[in-house]
Amino acid sequence: MDAAFVITPMGVLTITDTLYDDLDISIMDFIGPYIIGNIKTVQIDVRDIKYSDMQKCYFSYKGKIVPQDSNDLARFNIYSICAAYRSKNTIIIACDYDIMLDIEDKHQPFYLFPSIDVFNATIIEAYNLYTAGDYHLIINPSDNLKMKLSFNSSFCISDGNGWIIIDGKCNSNFLS
């Protein structure tokens, strides 16, 4: 599966031709098919947003970031503007303080955490654990496995209640 979106701390972005032109995104890591990125932003005062900024801006709401001309924007229940950020020459308007990620329209909240959160796992979805491209669902993983996964990865995706998605960054000596 090729990644069709970038997971960032501000939300999930669908990859488009103009995405990298509009936003200052740096790729930090991969978790299986998921790209983990960061958007370089500077917070600005909401009162400084001009009408011309609104012609080419993005909205962040409930874990998803969409351009102002997206059909998805109609589904957002936006009642207020919580914060605004500038990235390159584009504005991102945050409409809530929710850090939940909307990943592939799954109806389960996920959050981006450092890999150390793997120690809270009772269920692990592990990509690239033994060989490149493999996938394993592990129930009640051992502490030894959690330790090795935390050393091999920088980030994990978690529901905050014990379900972790992580990349094993397979190498030949991983579980020996």
Swiss-Prot record:
Gene Ontology terms describing biological process: symbiont-mediated suppression of host antigen processing and presentation of peptide antigen via MHC class II
GO CC terms: host cell endosome
Predominant location category: host cell
Record's subcellular location: Host endosome
Pfam family, one: Chordopox_A35R
Domain of life of the organism encoding this protein: Viruses
Keywords: Host endosome, Host-virus interaction, Inhibition of host adaptive immune response by virus, Inhibition of host MHC class II molecule presentation by virus, Signal, Viral immunoevasion
Induction cue: Expressed in the early phase of the viral replicative cycle.
Signal peptide: 1-14
Function in brief: Mildly affects the expression of MHC class II molecules on the surface of host antigen presenting cells (APCs).
Family: Belongs to the orthopoxvirus OPG163 family.
Protein name (database record): Protein OPG163
